[in-house]
A protein has these predicted regions:
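Glycine-rich phosphate-binding P-loop
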Residues: 82-109, 115
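Gly/Ala-rich beta-loop-alpha elbow adjacent to hydrolase catalytic centers
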Residues: 276, 280
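Conserved substrate/cofactor phosphate-moiety recognition/catalytic segment
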Residues: 101-134
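Patatin-like phospholipase
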Residues: 126-129, 135-138, 146-275, 285-413
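A short hydrophobic beta-strand segment most commonly corresponding to one strand
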Residues: 39-44
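A small-molecule sensor/coupling module
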Residues: 28-29, 46-81
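Cyclic nucleotide-binding regulatory domains
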Residues: 1-38
Length: 413
């Protein structure tokens, strides 16, 4: 609608109809259809369709099933479907094919049929690409050469696109801009992600904010070369088996999250995405920082249990405390780490009193996002950001499982 952001309602797969509701109701279309990939369309006149329905009632029954399925998907916002064809486009120099081949082997180890394809098939006919999709569970296209024709072809053949850059270098602004332009239909639907590659000895990523500004990805992933756990995590993400952990607020009760994280680790359950609210956000941030069980317990106890961070009592104009001790402890334990520089994708939620809606923090200083998420009204002074007043996320959304679902397709704990 005019004045509103574009919203993805669903994905029409090969062989499925588009515009069936408008055809049956003999009314104008209620949405636009955008070709994310190279497509061939067959137009069926209304009278021909009605004749087919009269000749075989199964046509209308199957169409009704599809319409009901799409209606449910629109309500649950689950219409994007599960992608099975992925593209990997290199930003800058560096070999990309070995990484994609390794991802393919990892996916095959999960029991799927998968193939990795490079520019050697650039001149193949359209039918060939369709046949590859039909005969494999997952298809991975690789574009690492400077051949713009192959890059454009990859962007027109995939369900989801990954730009791949080197995390130890600044983003190549011209290359990233060209990549964003060729992926514009996918980019508009938030179907373009960014992978930053790091050396095996990298302790923590840095400078990721610059990459976000240039590439404008829907999601950011960090991978260390030759790091088995990172490759396995990426394979789970591609196959829809990634695990998202969401931790709610609840004050002192949120300390139970530490035990929950430990139990998941003891059971060998991977944690691939993290999100949280209030104290749950603090614990989730610790996991994203890479804290082990012992370090997590020590830091949380030191910051919030051994001595109270809420004993800097203030004249209660804004809150009962000044909030300075909380600020100091967040700074001590999380430093100047940016959310984009965490090894695992992370978000936390605060309540925006200015707009009356919850606010999701995926960028910026981690400690500032946490400070907003734990700002319990009346106890801590509210946080401010861009002239917005932010308080504890639990005020409006204490369990943001739906936010996590929008980020990944796998199980959510």
């Amino acid at each position: 609608e005019p004045g509103h952001d574009v919203q993805l309602l669903g994905v029409i797969r090969p062989g499925e109809p588009a515009g069936e509701m408008s055809l049956i109701a003999d009314a104008p279309h209620s949405a636009d259809v955008v070709a994310l990939r190279d497509s061939e369309i067959i137009a069926v006149p209304r009278d021909v369709f009605l004749e087919a329905c009269e000749a075989d009632t199964a046509v209308m029954i199957e169409l009704a099933k599809l319409m009901m399925l799409r209606s449910r998907q629109a309500v649950t916002r689950g219409g994007a479907g599960e992608p099975s064809v992925f593209g990997f486009i290199s930003l800058g120099s560096g070999l990309l094919r070995p990484l994609v081949d390794r991802l393919a082997r990892e996916i095959a180890g999960l029991g799927y049929s998968v193939t990795a394809i490079g520019s050697e098939v650039q001149s193949a006919p359209t039918e060939w690409f369709s046949d590859v999709e039909r005969t494999h569970d997952f298809v991975l296209y690789v574009a690492e050469a400077p051949d713009s024709g192959w890059r454009h072809l990859v962007a027109r053949q995939v369900d989801r696109l990954f730009h791949v850059g080197r995390g130890d270098r600044n983003p190549p602004r011209s290359g990233a801009g060209a990549a964003a332009a060729l992926a514009s239909p996918l980019q508009a639907q938030q179907l373009v992600d960014l992978i930053l590659l790091h050396t095996p000895d990298t302790s923590r990523p840095s400078g990721s904010e610059a990459w976000l500004d240039v590439a404008r990805p829907a999601r950011l992933f960090h991978l260390r070369r030759d790091h088995d756990a990172d490759i396995a995590r990426m394979a789970r993400i591609l196959t829809g088996q990634s695990v998202g952990l969401v931790l709610s607020g609840g004050g002192a009760r949120a300390y139970a999250h530490i035990g929950a994280v430990r139990a998941l680790r003891e059971r060998g359950v991977p944690i691939d995405f993290l999100g949280g609210v209030s104290m749950g956000a603090v614990v989730a941030a610790g996991v994203a920082m890479g804290w082990g069980d012992a370090e997590m317990e020590r830091r949380i106890r030191e910051a919030f249990v051994t001595t109270s961070p809420l004993d800097d009592i203030a004249v209660p104009l804004l809150a009962m405390t000044h909030g300075m001790k909380v600020n100091e402890r967040l700074a001590h334990h999380f430093g100047d780490v940016q959310i984009a520089d965490l090894w695992l994708p992370f978000f936390c939620v605060s309540s925006n009193l200015t707009t009356g809606a919850y606010q999701v923090h995926r960028r910026g200083l981690l400690r500032e996002a946490l400070r907003a998420s734990i700002s319990l009204p009346g106890v801590l002074p509210p946080a401010t950001s861009d002239n917005n007043v932010l308080v504890d996320g639990a005020v409006l959304k204490n369990f943001p499982a739906d936010v996590m679902r929008a980020s990944q397709l796998g199980p959510i704990v």
